[in-house]
Structures are given as C-alpha cells and as structure tokens.
Amino acid sequence: MDLLQILYDAYNTPWLYILIAFGYAVLVALVLPIPIEIALLLPLIDGRWGYLASIGLAIAAGKTLGAWLIFWLGLNLEGSVRKWSERWRVARWFVARAERLVGKTGYTGLYLLLSVPMMSDTIPIYVYSLFNEEGRALERNMFLIANFLAAINRVAILSMAFVIGANLIHV
C-alpha cells in the first residue's frame, strides 16, 4: 500500500488523516526527500478549507517536531563534523561555506527556503542545523518558529496557487 492510498483511505476520518499528515511531516523533516504537499491534495481538490487549515497546522507541527530533533542532532554532531572536515581541504572548504551561508542568511534564509512549495525540507533543515556554529548563528526557538511559519506559508502559497489555477481553468 502506498502513501496516496493510505491518505485516500483515511481522508473521511479527519482525526486519522491529520495524525497521518503529522507523522508524515515529521518523517519528511527527518529523512524523506519528498514534498509534503501530497497530504494537501484531497482537501484542496474538494475545497474543504477548514479541513485544509487543520491539516496545515498538523503538518507545521510535525515539521517543527522533526526540525527540533534535527536541531538537537546538529548541536551534538557539529563538533564531530568540524573535526572530520579538518582532515580534507575540500571538506573544510565546504563546512566553511555552509557556516557562512547559515550565518549570512539566518532565519530569513531558512524561512524562505522552507516556504517554497514542492521543495524537499530535509536538506535545508540539516544544513541550517549542522552548520550553526555551535548554536551561535541560530537560536533554537527562533529556528523552530521559522520552520513552523514556513510550513504555514507553504500551505498558504499552495492553496492560493491552486485557487488561482482553478479559476483560470474555469474562465
């Protein structure tokens, strides 16, 4: 059974659908390199805006939980990554550039990257967590707020694009 079938079967049981969307969002943040928008298709097509808002909040909460786990992991692994990177010039160069990117773009860069519909969240979350200059470039709570708000923004962008596209087709 694939994810689409699981979502389709659970769609008319809102608490189950929302729970699946939450769990899926955690996995998308942690390991799945696929977009979360799959969970939004059915309520968008049906025009169930209240249901869509509930699913959007569940997705934002799930992605935030996943981001918190990755942030914690990043704080614990960053020293090892830095030590390892000192052995090879290319790795040292990459780590320095990644730290500079995170330091320069900060919360705004993270928010903008995570707001892009159909983009994988996994890589930006890991980059901003692992190359956080020992937790000095990004503070945990603001990192989590940026993740949550970007997830909400992403649902809003997708919803607006869907409504505009649907209206253009009916014109």
Residue ranges and their predicted role:
Residues 16-37:
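Hydrophobic transmembrane alpha-helices
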